[in-house]
Design a protein with these regions (language model features):
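Charged, low-complexity intrinsically disordered regions
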Residues: 1-13
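Helicase motor core with emphasis on the C-terminal RecA-like subdomain
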Residues: 13, 17, 21-54, 60-67, ...
Length: 324
């Protein structure tokens, strides 16, 4: 396992954690300091972990992605609304990796969907990041046991979990062995009763966080979403103010997607399959590439896939009911 502070050391000698924080987590302010110019510079860390020379810029020329990552590295509570495709995940992944490298702490990322968790872990591994894992129903019992052991041994620095995991006693015990450096809520609109994807267990997570930090300073909280109306944002702010007594540094980006073109084509329900077939022929027959067709139900996905296969298209359906 990696060298991380044992729980008894943190509880018996709290000054140790404070001293480590002063040494490794607080910039000294000297330009000539090699450590600070590397460990506290988001651009340097972006290059180290993801191989990019600069952060993505918004249509107004700013880089909210950079600003969000910097706030996370500084240990601030962050509420970020960044459009889909705007590099939202780097806003919390980069500080998480930086945090793990600096002090060995664990970042918990709460995510609502198993597929999203798997995609993030696969993406990090593809970037040669080996300290990321997910706890989800896609794991076998031996795989789950392996992840829990790695959490306790300090081998994992970025852990993605569903909110339901906070009710699991084995998981709770494993977390007690580690110092949690930040709690991140991806798809944070799931916290709001005004959101279409409200998940009650998202609200329970903050209760667990309060219990976890009962005898120690509260770790930073981050809330990230691509779609949040004003009433949803108000709900998120109120929830964390009421349960944890915190306020956020906010980064509210534009929802404008200049790289996308939208077209609305009215048609009858009975015409949708033929219309889908026609759109595919119009756009894919003469050029390479693929298409994603969204439907409103699992049955609809399976039936449309069967129809398109019958028309000669290489097509597969995907939904949450598929086995691992």
């Amino acid at each position: 396992g990696n060298s991380v502070l044992a729980p008894w050391v943190r509880h018996q000698f709290p000054e140790v954690g404070r001293i480590i924080g002063e040494l490794r987590d607080t910039p000294c302010g000297k330009k000539e300091c090699e450590y600070c110019s590397s460990e506290h510079d988001p651009v340097q860390e972006l290059k180290r972990y993801f191989g990019h020379d600069e952060f993505r810029r918004d249509s107004d020329g700013r880089s909210r992605q950079h600003d969000v990552a910097l706030a996370g590295m500084r240990g601030e509570n962050v509420l970020a609304v960044l459009a889909t495709g705007g590099g939202k995940s780097i806003g919390y992944q980069l500080p998480a990796l930086n945090r793990y490298h600096r002090n060995g702490s664990l970042t918990i990322i709460v995510s609502p969907l198993q597929s999203l968790m798997k995609d993030q872990v696969d993406g990090l591994i593809a970037s040669n990041v080996q300290c990321a894992a997910a706890l989800s129903g896609l794991l076998t019992l031996p795989e789950r046991a392996d992840v829990l052991e790695k959490i306790q041994m300090g081998d994992i620095g970025v852990l993605l979990v569903s909110p339901e995991q906070f009710r699991n006693n084995t998981f709770r015990r494993a977390l007690r062995q580690r110092q949690v450096g930040a709690w991140i809520f991806d798809e944070a609109h799931c916290l709001s009763k005004w959101g279409n994807d409200f998940r009650p267990d998202y609200l329970y997570a903050s209760r667990f966080i309060s219990e976890y930090h009962r005898d120690q300073p509260l770790a930073p909280i981050g809330c990230f979403t691509a779609t949040a109306k004003p009433d949803v944002l108000a709900d998120i702010r109120a929830h964390f103010q009421d349960t944890l007594g915190i306020t956020f540094k906010e980064f509210i980006g534009s929802h404008e997607r200049v790289n996308l073109r939208f077209e609305v084509v009215p048609c009858q329900k009975s015409e949708k399959r033929q219309r889908t077939q026609q759109l595919l022929e119009d756009n894919l027959v003469t050029q390479e590439g693929g298409a994603v067709v969204f439907v409103s139900s699992r049955k609809g996905a399976e039936e449309l896939s069967e129809f398109l296969v019958g028309k000669g298209w290489a097509c597969k359906y995907f939904h949450a009911g598929l086995p691992p």
